[in-house]
C-alpha cells in the first residue's frame, strides 16, 4: 500500500512538471544563431558552452546506453554540434574528436536499413556541404561524401515537380539542410503566432541564421529562458504531452487514481480547443487525440474541427501526410470511431480513408513486428467499442516500453514513458487479479450452493459472466457490483435456457406465478427444476436487494423483482410465439426483444452498487429507459446477426429472418444483416451520446454501466455467437482472472520484472 502511494505521488509530480528531453541537434542549431548587429558573436553563448561540456568520450554528441549501436540520429546531432563550434571558432579539440567519430561511423549515414530522423537525406548532406564550406575535413573517402551529397540532389529533384502544400511544408521544415535554396516567402508562410516555424527550434534557428526575424528571435529567447542552455526538439508540446499522459493512464488502467489531475488537464485542453489554439489545431495528431479524449470524457467538442482532414487528399497535403506519419493516421482512425450521431459525416469519411491507408500500411509491412504496426493492426481489428477494459489494460501493460520514444529530426523520449507508471499499473493489476480470483472462487461455491450446476439444460457460463464483470467493472473497491453483475448473469442464462429448452409450458407458467407472489415459503413447485430456479432467484435477489437497500437508503428489492418479472413475461411471449407459430411484426419483435435479451437483471441492479444514490423517479425516468433500450437493441441485433443460422435450424425467428420474411423476398439474408448492422451502429452512437451527455437524471457512473455492457455484447458477438462458443472466451477469462502479467524487457536496466 505504501509503495503504491509513493508511485502515485511521484506520478502526480510528473504530471505537474512535464519534462521534455534535451535535443542536442536543436541545441546546436540554436547555438549557431548570431547576435543581432554582430554576426561574429553567438546570440546564445550558453548553448555553445553546453555543447562544449556535453561531448561523449567517443567524440559524439548524443544519448546512447552502454553497448547501444550508433544511429543516424547521433551522427546528425554530432555534425550539428561540430558546425556550431566551428561557427564560433571554439573547441578545436572537440571538433577534431567529433570529426573522427563521424569518420569512423560514416557508413551508418548511408545505411538505409537504419532508422533515420525526419528529412535526414536533406539535412545531413546539407550540413556536410556547410561543413566543407567552413573548410572542415572529414576522415572519409570523398566518394562517400559525394554519394551522400548526391542523395540530397536526387531527393530535391524528385520533389521539384511536387507543388503541394505538404511538399512546401516539408521543405520549410528541413530548411537547415537547404541553406539559401529556399525562398524566404516560402518559409514565412509557416511561421506561427509564437514566432516559431512548426514549433521546431532547429527550423526556427536555421531560418534566423540566414534571415533575421523579430518574432523568431523572441521565440528562441523564450525557449532558452525556459530551458536554459539546452532545448527540446519541439516546443511548445504541453498539450500533446499532457494528453499523452491522460491516454497512458487510461490505457494502463490507473486513471482512477488521478481523477482531479486528469480533469485539470482536460479542462485546460478544452479551453485551448475552444480558443482554437495552434498547438492543437495545427498538429493533426494532437487535434485527433484531443477530440477523442475530450469527447470520451464528456466535453462538448464538434467534429467540424477535424474537417481539414475529412478527405484523404487533405491529409496528404499536410506535413504529417506528406511524411506518411503513422501515429497521426492511428489517432485520426481512433477519433473517427467516437461518433455520437449519424450526422457526423466528417468522422465517417475520416474513418473510411484512414482505415484504408492503415490496412495498406499493414499489408505492405509484411511480417515485421514494429510496435507502431502492431498498434495499427490492433486499432483496425478492435474498435474501442469492441474491447473490454481489463483485457486492454493487460495488453498495454505487457507491451509498455519505459524507454518509448518518437523520431522527428532527432529522437526524443515521451514524458509519460517511465518506470513509475509501469510499476503502478503492474501493482494495481496484480493485486486486483488476486481479488478477482477470490471472487470467482466465491461464485463457484454459490453456483453449487444454489444447485444451479444440477440443472441439465443450463449452460455453465459462470466464468464468462464473471469475465464481463471483472473486465469492465475493474476497480478493486467495486466488488459488490461485480458480484451482483456476475450472479445475475448466471441466473439470466439459466432462465433463458429454461424458457428455450428446459421448461414445459406448465413449468414456465409456474415459475412466473412464483415470482409474482414472491413468497419464500411457497411450496407449490411444478417440478424440482422450478424449485431450484426460483429458489436461486429468490435468495439471490433478496440478498442483493438487502445490500443495495442499505447503500441506497431505501428499499429497492421490489424494483429488482419487477425487473425479473418483466424478463420472464417477455420470454414467455417469445415461447408462445414459437409454440403457436405466430410471426410478429418487426416492431412487435423488437419491443419484446429488448427485454427478453436479458440484460435488465444484470445491468439495472448493479447500478445500485457503483456509488450514486438513485431515487425512484430516476429508475422511472425516460433517459433510464432509453439507455436500457439502446443497449439492449445493440445486443439483440448483434446476437441475431451472428446466431441467425443456428436459430434458423432450431426453428426460431429473429430480427434477420423477420426482415427477410416481411420484405416478401425483396431482400436477401446478407442485405437483412446489413440493415441490422446499420441499426446497431445507430443505436450504439445514440447510446454513446446519452452516456457522455451532461444533462439527464441518471448519474454518469451509472450511465457508464450501460456503455460497458454495450462493449461486452460487441466483444461477445462481433465475430461469432461468442456466448455459445466454448473456446471463444477461454483465453480472455484466463488473461483477466488467472494468468499473471508477462512483462517485456526493453533494456537491461531498471527492469521491474524482478519485483513482479
UniProtKB/Swiss-Prot annotation:
Annotated InterPro entries: Isoprenoid_synthase_dom_sf (IPR008949), Terpene_cyclase_plant_C1 (IPR044814), Terpene_synth_N (IPR001906), Terpene_synth_N_sf (IPR036965), Terpene_synthase-like (IPR050148), Terpene_synthase_metal-bd (IPR005630), Terpenoid_cyclase/PrenylTrfase (IPR008930)
Pfam name, any one: Terpene_synth
Keyword Magnesium listed: yes
EC class (word): lyase
Annotated localization: Plastid, Chloroplast
Record: residues binding Mg(2+) 1: 496, 500
Effect of residue 602 to T: Changes catalytic activity. Converts ent-copalyl diphosphate to ent-pimara-8(14),15-diene and diphosphate
GO molecular function, one term: magnesium ion binding
Catalytic reaction list: ent-copalyl diphosphate = ent-kaur-16-ene + diphosphate
Gene3D superfamilies xrefs: 1.50.10.160, Farnesyl Diphosphate Synthase, Terpene synthase, N-terminal domain
Coiled-coil annotated spans: none
Cofactor mode of binding and number, as noted: Binds 3 Mg(2+) ions per subunit.
Tissues in which the UniProt entry reports expression: Highly expressed in panicles and at lower levels in leaves and stems.
Gene Ontology CC, one term: chloroplast
Binding site for Mg(2+) 3: 639, 647
Chief site of localization: plastid
GO process annotations (BP): diterpenoid biosynthetic process; gibberellin biosynthetic process
The enzyme's E.C. designation: 4.2.3.19
Co-factor(s): Mg(2+)
Short motif DDXXD motif, span: 496-500
Domain notes: The Asp-Asp-Xaa-Xaa-Asp/Glu (DDXXD/E) motif is important for the catalytic activity, presumably through binding to Mg(2+).
Other known facts: Plants lacking KS1 display a dwarf phenotype with normal root development, but severe stunting of shoots in seedlings, dark green leaves and failure to initiate flowering. This phenotype can be rescued by treatment with exogenous gibberellin.
Protein task: Catalyzes the conversion of ent-copalyl diphosphate to the gibberellin precursor ent-kaur-16-ene.
Family stated for the protein in its record: Belongs to the terpene synthase family.
Protein name from the UniProt record: Ent-kaur-16-ene synthase, chloroplastic
Source organism: Oryza sativa subsp. japonica (Rice)
Gene behind the chain: KS1
